[in-house]
């Protein structure tokens, strides 16, 4: 079978250097949303490595674009921080702890928990709510890999309780997150949405 040869420029285009990774673009410069509100929904620092050129909650800043339905990023969370419950309906989300430790909350109300230490992995199937928090005494670092159909990256919903937490913290902020394509309907019967 014939193989493909890559030029030096093509190799450079498909290479990501950790030192050059940029924070996700969707919320980076949004001054209408407090850091505390961002911290409820996202890891404090998300650095996309690989993205598809489709609508997704991470924006359009990545080192590499297009990898056959794969999204990959590095998340850094300070102690006690991490994104709350959310659900990817069409994609698998797999987490690998690079440094520190995280506690994952799984289920519509986070009723199940699993702690991951350095080098541990949790793979969450589509349709399951999950959130996580850094339970270490210093920054923890997570590699996240999302797989599934390339056109299914805009598949994230959050439980109503997340909307309530946001509104209690910063009234009127929900439209900023809804503009990213996030809906606060996870766990609701489709007839009630």
Feature map (PLM): residue ranges:
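Conserved short histidine dyad/triad with adjacent acidic residue
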Residues: 53-60, 71-88
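Double-stranded beta-helix
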Residues: 2-9, 131-193
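Short histidine-centered beta-strand/loop micro-motifs
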Residues: 61-66, 83-89, 106, 113-115, ...
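Histidine-centered metal-chelating micro-motifs
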Residues: 82-84, 103, 120-122, 126-132
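Glycine- and acidic-residue-biased ligand/ion/polar-headgroup-sensing regions
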Residues: 90-103
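A short, N-terminal "cap"/entry segment at the start of jelly-roll beta-barrel domains
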Residues: 1-69, 172-193
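Short acidic-glycine-tyrosine-enriched beta hairpin
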Residues: 108-126
